[in-house]
Swiss-Prot record:
Protein role: Has bactericidal activity.
Native source species: Rattus norvegicus
GO cellular component: extracellular region
Keyword terms of this UniProt record: Antibiotic, Antimicrobial, Defensin, Disulfide bond, Secreted, Signal
Highest taxon in the source lineage: Eukaryota
Protein name: Beta-defensin 50
SS bond list: C34-C63, C46-C64
InterPro entries: Defb50
Single GO biological process annotation from the record: defense response to bacterium
Signal peptide (UniProt feature, chain positions): 1-23
Family: Belongs to the beta-defensin family.
Pfam families, sorted: Defb50 (PF17546)
């Protein structure tokens, strides 16, 4: 049940952040990065945390989802 809720959360976040297909200026994509759990506890600036299968499988890390605009790349 937790996995289902997590998948719904991630798909909801992706639908909010991914506003278009392709590389048009102003398009927002989501980047994933793994950070140590201790950094997450002590204030790493991450807007959304989650788990993604196959990414950040280490028990000592969490997955951070960061929205990125293509004009900032």
């Amino acid at each position: 049940m937790k996995t289902l809720h997590l998948l719904l959360l991630i798909s909801g976040l992706l639908s909010v952040f991914v506003k278009g297909v392709g590389s048009h200026p102003g398009t927002v994509h989501v980047r994933f990065k793994c950070i140590p759990k201790i950094a997450a506890v002590f204030g790493d600036n991450c807007p959304f945390y989650g788990n993604v299968d196959g990414l950040c499988n280490d028990k000592k890390s969490v997955c951070c989802m960061v929205p990125v605009r293509l004009d900032n790349i």
